[in-house]
A protein has these predicted regions:
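Beta1/beta-strand and adjacent pyrophosphate-binding region of the FAD-binding site
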Residues: 2-16
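Core beta-strand elements of the Rossmann-like FAD/NAD(P) dinucleotide-binding domain
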Residues: 4-6, 150-160
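A short, Lys/Arg-enriched amphipathic alpha-helix followed by its capping loop at the start of a domain
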Residues: 20-29, 120
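Short beta-strand segments that buttress and anchor functional surface loops
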Residues: 143-146
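A conserved short coil-to-beta-strand element within the FAD-binding core of flavoproteins
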Residues: 127-141
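Active-site-adjacent segment of FAD-dependent monooxygenases/related oxidoreductases
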Residues: 43-116
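Glycine-rich FAD pyrophosphate-binding loop
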Residues: 25-45
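Short hydrophobic core segments
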Residues: 10-11, 156-167
Length: 168
């Protein structure tokens, strides 16, 4: 494989892209993180966190910064407020972590993720930048993107591309 500017380009900087940025930074992998939005979305979408998420985050050393609360159960109600599906979380294994399922407030979770990802010198984070094109040849990913504010266009390359752009 030929030399590239980055090892990985991360397309999207929501919860999955933020997690990738933190893990790539933790392992010293040179990454370019791109997202068309400058700021995090202010409303929650992802709201739960299980033991698998917690294991991944343990590597990033910021678990104490994330505010979580335990889920005791769920009671889904119809329009007349009658219970139609009730689930209790009693008896779920905790896998030596806090609890198997926790509630999170995603905007706060995103902010903690992003602040932590900045500390890794191998991360280049460019929010407010939109990917224009991606192609791959001879084991190299070529990417062009532009700064949405200035319109300035850039070209770069990497060994890998992680598509973390979610619903966008």
């Amino acid at each position: 494989m030929s030399d590239t500017e980055y090892d990985v380009i991360v397309a999207g900087y929501g919860p999955v892209g933020e997690t990738c940025a933190n893990l790539l930074g933790y392992y010293g992998i040179k990454a370019l993180i791109l997202d068309k939005e400058k700021e995090t979305f202010p409303l929650p979408r992802a709201i739960t966190w299980d033991a698998e998420c917690q294991r991944a985050m343990a590597h990033c050393n910021f678990l104490t910064e994330v505010k979580t609360r335990k889920i005791r159960g769920v009671d889904n109600k119809d329009a007349k407020k009658r219970s139609i599906l009730k689930i209790t979380m009693d008896g779920f294994d905790t896998y030596n972590y806090q609890h198997s399922i926790l509630f999170i407030h995603q905007p706060q979770f995103d902010q903690v993720h992003r602040e932590n990802a900045k500390k890794y010198q191998t991360n280049t984070i460019r929010t407010g930048n939109e990917i224009l094109s991606v192609d791959q040849s001879d084991g190299v990913v070529n990417c062009s993107y532009k700064n949405i504010e200035t319109g300035e266009e850039f070209k770069t390359n990497s060994k890998y591309l992680l598509a973390c752009d979610g619903a966008n």
